[in-house]
Amino acid sequence: DHEFDAVVVGAGGAGLRAAFGLSEAGFNTACGTKLFPTRSHTVAAQGGINAALGNMEEDNWRWHFYDTVKGSDWLGDQDAIHYMTEQAPASVVELENYGMPFSTTEDGKIYQRAFGGQSLKFGKGGQAHRSCCVADRTGHSLLHTLYGRSLRYDTSYFVENFALDLLMENGECRGVIALCIEDGSIHRIRAKNTVIATGGYGRTYFSCTSAHTSTGDGTAMVTRAGLPCQDLEFIQFHPTGIYGAGCLITEGCRGEGGILINSQGERFMERYAPVAKDLASRDVVSRSMTLEIREGRSWGPEKDHVYLQLHHLPPEQLATRLPGISETAMIFAGVDVTKEPIPVLPTVHYNMGGIPTNYKGQVLKHVNGQDQVVPGLYACGEAACASVHGAIRLGANSLLDLVVFGRACALSIAESCSPGDKVPPIKANAGEESVMNLDKLRFADGSIRTSELRLSMQKSMQSHAAVFRVGSVLQEGCEKISQLYGELKHLKTFDRGMVWNTDLVETLELQNLMLCALQTIYGAEARKESRGAHAREDYKVRVDEYDYYXA
């Protein structure tokens, strides 16, 4: 048993920012993470972080606000978006003060590149250059900068501790219970405030850009605690994942001048989006690519991908602005970008939905049609859904989301509590269900391997709830996923030990993934409209009445 003023679950960009924000304010803070902090998935973000700094041309946060609301397909929470875009320039300056090595222009300002869906003057002033970047490794720099910063403070890190469940009492959150992967010990971390920053659940799909650790642990913990999730059916497909490997090729490539071509050598985006062309918003590009592939204007023996061409760009531009991409393409596709195009395919990239919060990061539940704050529980980052992204996220808004809302969680805890406040007691047997579940899985002796069941789930999500969705296929998907969820009882685990039992951890992650997959596909089936990333072929129109009541 441990006792803290606050505990943060997850140590990616949002988790670290929340944790050292709390420590800075004098709170005795714990940060539990199943990975070493710099292994978190934030490290894989490539493109950049949006802020209306106006280094490349005149810019205004209100224009960024407009683009984000429009980009969310009018589902985003405008208070939260207002807060995020207004805070953006200060957040980027703060990062630079922490020592983040941004790419710069010749006169020493932060370099900003063009990204999809970004405009000037409320959509009337043409393409905006708003995405501050560190070549094509922005997330890597961000995470290492934040981690370096967090070491100045006295935060207690529980590294390689897998959070099992929230400790809830009388509708309040009193902390978390976690498994230490290193020695198999169980830790109850009691705290007055708990922040969930566990990232997304991209691994519910077969082809995705997320790390194998993006298993929606926080989302599932909240579900098990009987709290609602929001907008899980909105899943962003990134237009350019490497064919076969799923590795991400940043939108920055198209921001620097790369183009998509079909098997006739035609730059097909000119047909679908005459103005923005290859920098249209991500759902538009993904759907256009899918249509080209369906209609047979695609490459490969199975005619199932298109090409991203960069070799018309000068080699020195590729070397300075996109060094990591040249390397990634070589390793995962065997392609030399200066001579040949990269095979790409739309790939699951980001979860817009998650744990519902307000712009202060407080988790909400829905009681009699009203939002109600869950005492002691906060969420930020990809796990949360303050809904700054609505139905589809704009590129380079996610790193901004991490830093702004990680900080917001720390600030709102500091507003409502002070360091050293008494931690409310918990029942002596709190968390015993989690331990029972753990033991049950450790000795599980059924007929299906974890990996087999996981693969069936990923394949069925990929085929039933992809870029285009139809009612009949979604219903079939709901039945299939429900059936697979039932098969969790028949799992077989092989490692009975307690030390570094990865078999057990993967099985726990599968339980979490299943809960996310179930809610996602049922949500998609129930949302009878097309909006943002959720494109229904049988309901092609957006239903604006949905904006006003919970579907």
UniProtKB/Swiss-Prot annotation:
Membrane-related topology note:
Peripheral membrane protein
Locate the Tele-8alpha-FAD histidine modifications and list their residues: H41
Enzyme type, top EC level: oxidoreductase
Q: Where is the active site?
A: R282 (proton acceptor)
The record, for NCBIfam families, names: sdhA_forward, sdhA_frdA_Gneg
Q: What does this protein do?
A: Flavoprotein (FP) subunit of succinate dehydrogenase (SDH) that is involved in complex II of the mitochondrial electron transport chain and is responsible for transferring electrons from succinate to ubiquinone (coenzyme Q). SDH also oxidizes malate to the non-canonical enol form of oxaloacetate, enol-oxaloacetate. Enol-oxaloacetate, which is a potent inhibitor of the succinate dehydrogenase activity, is further isomerized into keto-oxaloacetate. Can act as a tumor suppressor.
Q: According to its UniProt record, which protein family does this protein belong to?
A: Belongs to the FAD-dependent oxidoreductase 2 family. FRD/SDH subfamily.
The identity of this protein, by name, is Succinate dehydrogenase [ubiquinone] flavoprotein subunit, mitochondrial
Its source organism is Mesocricetus auratus
